[in-house]
Design a protein with these regions (language model features):
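Hydrophobic, aromatic-rich transmembrane alpha-helices
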Residues: 22-29, 183-207, 211-217
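Membrane-interface alpha helices of multi-pass inner-membrane proteins
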Residues: 89-109, 115-120, 214-222
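Specific aromatic-rich, kink-prone transmembrane helix
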Residues: 65-85, 93-101, 239-242
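Perimembrane helix-loop-helix junctions
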Residues: 114-141, 198, 253
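Extracytoplasmic
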Residues: 110-111, 151-157, 267-436, 440-442
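Hydrophobic/aromatic-rich transmembrane helices and adjacent perimembrane loops
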Residues: 68-69, 113-114, 224-258
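Short acidic/glycine- and proline-prone juxtamembrane loop motifs at membrane-interface regions
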Residues: 56-66, 228-229
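Transmembrane-helix motifs of polytopic, lipid-linked glycan transferases
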Residues: 12-34, 41
């Protein structure tokens, strides 16, 4: 599109989403007339940093873009929660906030809980359920229904084939303690600071709806149970946003607490420390080493690529950095690897029928992968070295060692091994000429 790389267009769309989200939120906050409006505008760069810098390795993920557009809806909820508001939001702002906020639900429907929780705060605050049926919620519901209907009409195979497989295999693989350690402790620290910053005898509506959304955002994180940093971003962002909103409240009166007398540093410093700790999971990158990339680029030109790995990070962004092209229907082997894991779990629990069912899913996947390798003959095979449970099955049981016998090792690092097809010839490069025997007719004619 427009001759630009996809990464450029995705980044441009992300920055546009951030601009729309912050601008519309600013309009809503200003019209609502919050006492902290001036301070919030002064903290605008901090909110922008949370949407542009803080996401780190989650930048341009669906949750990131969805949260950038979700902020106006939170601001609208805060406005509706005000008991002393001079006026209520008009239909135009409600429509825009609903349109903007619906993106997060289109990303993943269970983020609807992040809409419901702030709406319940408004209902309790106003002592009326009318806010649950506000215009913005009807807009969100309508968009979701239209989207689901469109997907079902255009891609009926998604609901018929793909979604049941995702629920049966992908959805059943999860972790718990890594999420608690990686995100739970830092999130609890943020909530602790929210409690410390909460003003006495006041109800800061903006902070309240952000906190409610943050608490609600923890449920999808544990429900998905994968531990990816972008899954935690909605909950972490809303918690930090609540802290910013509390810092903007004028003349905050802190709650006295003898248990916290040891805390002598200013709360702003503690807030900065909490944000820094919460940022740690977003700091790391999956960029491959320059030596690996250079070796592949030197030997190939726009190669076709296939993975032997359950994790797509083995091939992305590597594939883009070498100007490669994935040729497999399933880019990564998550389906086969997850089915293998579930089969072993079922066998350990004594459920033989379930174990055999998942074995069959794995076998069908591997056979289709072998057929694709034979038919498409990828130039490059990216092999994940530390995924032994899966790769040992491919090599020992399904004969992928015979497939890789037609490849040679080009380069490898600590995590990946790159195979190059034996008969691959780099476009534009002629193979070296064979020396001519002195007894040959050509030599004799010379």
């Amino acid at each position: 599109m427009l001759g630009a790389a996809p990464e450029i267009l995705v980044e441009a769309w992300t920055y546009l989403a951030v601009l729309i989200g912050l601008s519309l939120s600013g309009v809503i906050v200003k019209r609502a007339g919050f006492t902290e409006t001036a301070s919030l505008f002064a903290l605008g760069p901090a909110f922008c940093a949370m949407l542009v810098i803080f996401p780190g390795n989650a930048f341009s993920e669906r949750e990131h873009i969805g949260m950038a557009l979700f902020i106006p809806l939170l601001a609208l909820h805060a406005w509706r929660a005000r008991r002393d508001a001079a006026a209520q939001p008009g239909p135009r702002l409600a429509l825009l906030a609903g349109l903007s906020g619906s993106i997060l639900l289109l990303v993943k429907p269970y983020y609807a809980i992040m809409v419901l929780a702030p709406a319940l705060v408004v209902a309790v605050r106003r002592r009326s359920l009318k806010s649950i049926f506000a215009l913005e919620h009807w807009v969100i519901g309508g968009i979701c229904v239209v989207y689901l209907s469109t997907v079902t009409l255009i891609h009926p195979e998604f609901m018929r084939d793909i979604y049941p497989l995702l629920a049966d295999v992908y959805g059943k693989i999860g972790i718990f303690w890594p999420i608690v350690i990686g995100y739970g402790f830092s999130w609890c620290f943020l909530v602790f600071l929210i409690w410390r910053l909460w003003p006495a005898m006041r109800f800061p509506e903006l902070a309240a709806v952000a906190l409610a959304a943050s608490i609600a955002g923890m449920f999808p994180l544990f429900y998905q149970a994968k531990g990816w940093s972008y899954h935690a971003y909605p909950a972490i962002f809303c918690a930090v946003a609540a802290i910013f909103c509390l810092l903007a409240v004028p003349r905050i009166v802190q709650q006295p607490s003898k248990l916290l007398a040891f805390v002598t540093a200013p709360l702003r410093a503690w807030a900065l420390a909490a944000v820094a700790i919460a940022f740690l999971p977003y700091w790391s990158t999956q960029k491959p080493g320059p030596a690996l990339v250079a070796a592949i680029r030197a030997a190939t030109d726009r190669p076709t690529v296939a993975l032997v790995s359950s994790d797509i990070s083995s091939g992305h962004p590597l594939n883009r950095m070498i100007d490669g092209h994935f040729v497999s229907t399933h880019v990564s082997d998550w389906l086969g690897a997850f089915a293998l894991s579930l089969s072993r779990q079922a066998a350990l629990s004594g459920d033989t029928a379930e174990a055999m069912r998942y074995q069959a899913i794995m076998a069908r996947y591997v056979e289709s992968k072998r057929e694709e390798f034979a038919r498409l003959r990828p130039d490059i095979v990216v092999f994940k070295k530390n995924n032994t449970m899966w790769t040992s099955q491919l090599m020992g049981r399904f004969g992928f060692d015979a497939v890789l016998a037609h490849y040679r090792i080009l380069v490898e690092d600590e995590t990946e091994r790159i195979y190059l097809r034996d008969d691959y010839v780099r476009p534009g490069h002629r193979p070296p000429e064979q020396p001519i025997s002195a007894s040959s007719p050509v030599a004799a004619s010379d």
